[in-house]
Amino acid sequence: MTQIGTPLSPTATRVLFCGSGELGKEVVIELQRLGVEVIAVDRYENAPAMQVAHRSHVINMLDGAALRAVIEAEKPHFIVPEIEAIATATLVELEAEGFTVIPTARAAQLTMNREGIRRLAAEELKLPTSPYHFADTFEAYSKAVEDLGFPCVVKPVMSSSGKGQSLLKSTDDVQKAWDYAQEGGRAGKGRVIVEGFIDFDYEITLLTVRHIGGTTFCAPVGHRQEKGDYQESWQPQAMSPVALAESERVAKAVTEALGGRGMFGVELFIKGDQVWFSEVSPRPHDTGLVTLISQDLSQFALHARAILGLPIPLIRQFGPSASAVILVEGQSTQTAFANLGAALAEPDTALRLFGKPEVNGQRRMGVALARDESIEAARAKATRASQAVNVEL
């Protein structure tokens, strides 16, 4: 049986977050509601989740020694990776020493790198994926492009939020896509994956939670991406029963192989009744922000319950819902948001402003949420709310 102590006392249940962005912030809030003591770690000060945690630490999370020092000092009952860019080899060591990593250290390690998870899905689990090659050099990359043909997609094996990702349509794109991939990788220059392009009808995120009572799926989330970054999402995405059943089969196979407990965002391509595995995040997913308005238990509440070993008997869906991001472009350390009354004037709308301490270039600083009678109406309403927000840099 799960027992939760008193925060900041010897009986406290301590959860440490590696990464403190807007997704982590919502999970921290859910854990705070259950009386959990939360420690937030990131590479910069005043990150969103730090603002709602009991305390925080600023370290380079790719530095294994620094990560180990914080974890050994804090002695958390649960370590929760919130981003990919972490010294995952250190998490594997810590797990072997008795710490609990959510969902598992292996899941964090495999999904930090597109190669690990692609080989697991395609080669071990024999799940349908796009055709692919990995390449370390421009020569190997050029050969991979030639082999797969146009159009094709190139991504650094280590990157997030679409960084370094390109769609190649002709030989004119080959050099610039390689250069962009080399700039966009998280751990510096290097290896890329080249994928054959799947002419899909739509893509979904199947939010899949592994918990004490088994595996539960949220209704499928549809989304629209630009340059690999999510702009809007909606739930439920209309699908054929065959495609939905196959999506759940694929998601269950991948999440079972990764193991542990927690929320997983499984990204899939759909064409008719066909399903291809794309990627998986072993944590809440940005497109799943829509669940803040679409479900009685958001993906963040579900993650918190799963982490703590609490049951998830039912997920109630409230009907057609959507999210639209609030993107800010420019430079500021004192961004202000105005016209919020207009943004929230319609019924069944909500806003989340993430409280990020600065913007330098383009950054997702918030999200508008809406429910309506249809997906089209919910999307339009969320977009109206998002566009109504005036940003002052």
Curated annotation (Swiss-Prot):
Its EC number is 6.3.1.21. Mg(2+) binds at E267, E279. It catalyses: N(1)-(5-phospho-beta-D-ribosyl)glycinamide + formate + ATP = N(2)-formyl-N(1)-(5-phospho-beta-D-ribosyl)glycinamide + ADP + phosphate + H(+). Pfam families: ATP-grasp, PurT_C, RS_preATP-grasp-like. It comes from the Bacteria. InterPro entries: ATP-grasp, ATP-grasp_carboxylate-amine, ATP_grasp_subdomain_1, PreATP-grasp_dom_sf, PurT, PurT/PurK_preATP-grasp, PurT_C. One of its GO terms (cellular component) is cytosol. Residues 119-308 form the ATP-grasp domain. GO terms for biological process: 'de novo' IMP biosynthetic process. ATP binds at R114, K155, S160, S161, G162, K163, G164, Q165, E195, G196, F197, I198, E203. N(1)-(5-phospho-beta-D-ribosyl)glycinamide binds at E22, L23, E82, D286, K356, R363, R364. Pathway: Purine metabolism; IMP biosynthesis via de novo pathway; N(2)-formyl-N(1)-(5-phospho-D-ribosyl)glycinamide from N(1)-(5-phospho-D-ribosyl)glycinamide (formate route): step 1/1. PROSITE patterns: ATP_GRASP (PS50975). Keywords: ATP-binding, Ligase, Magnesium, Metal-binding, Nucleotide-binding, Purine biosynthesis. The keyword rRNA-binding does not apply. One of its GO terms (molecular function) is phosphoribosylglycinamide formyltransferase activity. HAMAP family: PurT. Involved in the de novo purine biosynthesis. Catalyzes the transfer of formate to 5-phospho-ribosyl-glycinamide (GAR), producing 5-phospho-ribosyl-N-formylglycinamide (FGAR). Formate is provided by PurU via hydrolysis of 10-formyl-tetrahydrofolate. NCBIfam families: PRK09288.1 (NF006766), purT (TIGR01142). Homodimer. Belongs to the PurK/PurT family. This is Formate-dependent phosphoribosylglycinamide formyltransferase. It comes from Pseudomonas syringae pv. syringae (strain B728a).
